[in-house]
Every structure is written in structure tokens, then in C-alpha cells.
Amino acid sequence: MNYITFGKGEKPLILIQGLSTRSIKGAAFSVAYMYRMFARDYKVYLFDRRENISDSITVRNLATDIAMAMDTLKITNADIFGVSQGGMIAQYLAIDRPDLVNQLVLAVTLSKNNETVERTVNDWIHITEQNNMKRLITDMAEKMYSDIYVKRYKPFMSLLAVLQKPKNVPRFIALAKACLSCKAYDELD
């Protein structure tokens, strides 16, 4: 499992990103720059999803992967920040391994699916299977960002479709399907 780490602080901060078309490999500088506000107070870690993913992987399995990585690096009592699919993973991390979690911050995520999420994720899977990357990137942007943001960057969608095209299409589809496995609601305190 690839990961990025930066920061000079003593406290560990685990960032768990959302569903992405690409891995974090080669993105250390840009990630460290985007999250530089945490670098003074925290030792920041951003874990990628593992390379080889089965078609039946769940967000709970992804949480287990992060727990194993944290165990390997001897990270405990960390502040956890999960965004979107990363928030789903973070919830299972807190449920299954509370010893690893000091504080949990969740953003734009859910603890159980609804019809909108199921329809959206299934659309992304179908679009990806059709190899229509411009449509995938445009649809993801329209669903994830504000109208103002999308309008501002609309001229760049063709370029983003090339830059953000999944390098490993089956991996992306498996990770998208994993979003549909989130059922943490009844296990949360």
C-alpha cells in the first residue's frame, strides 16, 4: 500500500481520501501543499488503497487495510479525517479499531446508502465500463462540486478526462462498488 507522509508535528493525522480515478503515487508534493496547514502540528499520513483489489472488496475491508498499515507504522490514537468514501472507511476504522482513533472528522460522506448514491455510483461504473472518461470526469465533477466551481473549470474537462483517466479500470470499478457496501449506521454510537 502506497502512502504519503509529511509534517513536523508529534500528533498523527490520518487523511483518508474519497473515491479517486488515480492512485496517490507521484502526488506527494501536491498533497503536502494542499494540506500544508496541518504540517506544523501533525505528522500527516495519506494512505492509498492497495494495488490489487478484488471485485468484492468492501469499505470495511479498506478500513482493515488502513488499520494494518497503522499497526505496521505503530500509529495509535490518531486524529482521522475521512472525506466521501474515505469517511465511510473512517467510520469502520473507528467501529472496528477504536484504539487507533483519537478524534474522527467526517466530510461529505454517509453511514448508509440511499437511492441517489446508488444511482450515481452505478452510473459511474457504467460510464467507466463504456470507456467514456470525459463523461465520467464531468459527471463526477458535477456531483461533487458546486455549480460555480464546475462552470469555472468546464473548459478544462477534456484535459482532466485525459489526466484523471483511471490507469486501472477494474480497480476503479471495484472501489466504486465498495461505496455501495457502506452500512455502518446501525453500528455507530
Briefly describe each language-model feature range.
Residues 1-53:
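Conserved HGGG/HGGXW glycine-rich cap/lid loop of the alpha/beta-hydrolase fold
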Residues 12, 43, 77-79, 100-103:
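Structural signature of beta-strand start/N-cap positions in the alpha/beta core
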Residues 24-26, 56, 90-91, 115-116:
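Short glycine-/acidic-enriched loop or helix-start segments at secondary-structure transitions
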Residues 31-81:
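Active-site loop/oxyanion-hole signature of alpha/beta-hydrolase fold enzymes
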Residues 33, 61-68, 123, 139, ...:
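Alpha-helical elements of Rossmann-like donor-binding domains used by nucleotide-donor carbohydrate transfer enzymes
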Residues 82-86, 90:
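Gly/Ala-rich beta-loop-alpha elbow adjacent to hydrolase catalytic centers
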Residues 91, 95, 101-132, 171:
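Flexible "cap/lid" loop of the alpha/beta hydrolase fold
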Residues 115-118, 133-187:
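Conserved alpha/beta-hydrolase catalytic His-Asp/Glu region
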